[in-house]
Design a protein with these regions (language model features):
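Catalytic Zn2+-binding segment of zinc metalloproteases
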Residues: 213-225
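Auxiliary, metal-adjacent structural segments of Zn-dependent hydrolase domains
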Residues: 60-189
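Generic alpha-helical secondary structure signal
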Residues: 15, 54, 58-61, 65, ...
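Long amphipathic alpha-helical segments used for membrane anchoring, targeting, substrate engagement
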Residues: 1-45, 119-151
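Short pre-active-site segment immediately N-terminal to the catalytic Zn-binding motif
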Residues: 191-209
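Hydrophobic, well-ordered secondary-structure segments
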Residues: 158, 207-211, 216
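Extreme N-terminal leader/anchor segments
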Residues: 16, 22, 26, 30-33, ...
Length: 225
């Protein structure tokens, strides 16, 4: 603890703020509660349907075997067999958002941990600085920034996923593999809304999305990828 009596807590002399800072300090590298809240806020702005439109889901289901055949013609029999055995799930934007946050949670945790570690150049720059004897206000701001970083990162990631959920056609708008590996996610209502906005035939748009998603799924299932 420094001479000012605050230690690592800039609000050590104020009980209410001190308790709040302790809670923030124990939230880990990324605050997932805030990330989920901001993601849900992003998907709720459009006032979408609580469930997938059955007609849109059935229309996609009928095209899946044809899309599997076309992808198999290019990528081979092994890819066609894998896609024919895959499980296909149909989500609303809000459901896609929740699934994506859970699927990429380990990745975002690793990112947050890496961002929270000082680089070699930054660490070297502070080698000769005695933090205990530095300016109290500067020390307080450094501690406050480190405590707020998980919440701010949670806001950023939650807002990003929430906005992406409003436009995503499937799980490979972000070209990253995700678990479970044998599942393909599709967002029928968003696909149809896009086709309607651009005056495109719905069947053509659905087939394009299916081929894009199935091709990405088949490639990312290759072990060396």
């Amino acid at each position: 603890m420094g001479e000012n009596g605050m230690g690592d807590n800039p609000f050590g002399g104020l009980p209410f703020f001190g308790d709040m800072m302790k809670a923030m300090a124990g939230q880990g590298p990324l605050n997932w509660d805030i990330a989920q809240q901001f993601a849900v806020m992003g998907t709720s702005t459009e006032g979408g349907q609580p469930n997938v439109d059955p007609a849109a889901r059935i229309a996609l289901e009928q095209l899946i075997p044809i899309a599997v055949m076309h992808v198999g013609d290019v990528l081979g029999d092994a890819a066609q067999l894998s896609l024919s055995q895959a499980k296909y799930e149909f989500f609303t934007p809000a459901q896609w958002c929740h699934s994506t946050l859970n699927a990429y949670k380990p990745l975002f945790n690793e990112l947050a941990t890496a961002l929270g570690q000082p680089s070699a150049s930054t660490a070297g720059a502070h080698t000769d600085i005695d933090l205990e004897n530095s300016d109290p206000m500067s020390q307080m701001m450094r501690n406050l920034a480190s405590m707020m970083a998980p919440s701010l990162l949670g806001m950023t990631i939650g807002s990003m996923i929430g906005q992406l959920a409003l436009k995503a056609f499937g799980q490979y708008d972000l070209l990253l593999p995700r678990s479970p590996e044998n599942t393909v996610l599709l967002v029928p209502d968003t696909i149809d809304d896009f086709a309607e906005s651009w005056s495109s035939p719905h069947a053509d748009m659905r087939m394009w999305v299916l081929i894009h998603e199935l091709a990405a799924h088949a490639v990312l299932q290759v072990p060396h990828i």
